[in-house]
UniProtKB/Swiss-Prot annotation:
Protein name stated in the entry: 41 kDa protein
Keyword list, A-Z: Plasmid
Source organism: Lactobacillus helveticus (Lactobacillus suntoryeus)
Biased composition (Basic and acidic residues): 157-169
Residue ranges of the region described as Disordered: 132-197
Record flagged with keyword Nucleotide-binding: no
Amino acid sequence: MEVFFMRRYSATQINAELFWKFPKFLSINKKYVGLTNDDRMAYMLIKDRYRYSLSNNWIDKDKNVYVYFTIDDLKELLHVGKNKVTRIKQHLIDYGLLEIVKQGFDPQNKKNYPDRIYLLQPEYDPTDLISQSSHASALEQSGIPKMGTRYQNEGNLDNKGKSDSENCNKDTSALEQSGIPKMGANKDNNSSDTIKDTIKDTDQWNFSTNNYTPEQVTAQNQDLLSHLGETLTGDKEAPMFLNKDSINLIAKWFRTPEGASECISTILNAANDSRKNAESQIGHHELYFEDYNNELKRMITNRLRRYFNKMRTAKDGKIKNPKNYLYVSMRNMFDKWQNDVLMAEKDKANNKD
């Protein structure tokens, strides 16, 4: 029998984990009692993707937000098979919680586009809303910290998501701003001194921009961006692809460290995907990007300048997804460069023979 090592949580680890937000109506609203737990979990996972929708501007002409969520994505996250995922999606459609709009082939752009997935708002029971209102009033009179409403919490939590570069400090900050009361130690709740101390200690480690003046936030961002190259020195991957000119370019065009970090991650993802694609087609080969440091870094700098020039000169609305445009641009460059080097080495080997 396998023995598991069990550890208790320390006070500093409580907020260090990432969480999905589970909509309460999925469990308490009688209209949706027929949903399975997998159905509810799928709704929650799709709702979480709205964070990426907002950052990528996945908003249709009617200003409705949509997501992209493949069957493989749901299979992996729910740990179920393809048929089960199909049934789950159909259940959500039958209950009026999901709508799928097929995109298909766009003859103008000559591309196949994935289906758009829209989550639909649930039908609330009016009596539930009244009871929630009464409950909130009762809490105010009881001295118990009042929970934010579902809509208030959504507005704060849904904006915390970033790219894969999320870290626990950001998520902790977002949770602290979500309207959820901060839980103190198991002490006398009537002690005003205890409450003041708890708030004071928490605020000292809350780095949300909400805790600073706009001038302070601007100064902080400028400092981090001006030293962007130094912050990357501990990253074993980033210096391999980016020279000083590229780092300075990124720092000039992005106003926040989050934006600069996401730009760098996009370039790295394009490079890694290009390498993986080549290996899947021709098998393992001895070509590594780091072997061609200077050449590749100069190419990235030139491609970045072309990208920013395109962003500046393109007509408003023509490029709907700048992040995706950068990824495709870099991916095409990596693919072509890698193919050219491999072909040159192949020709060199043939000439020796």
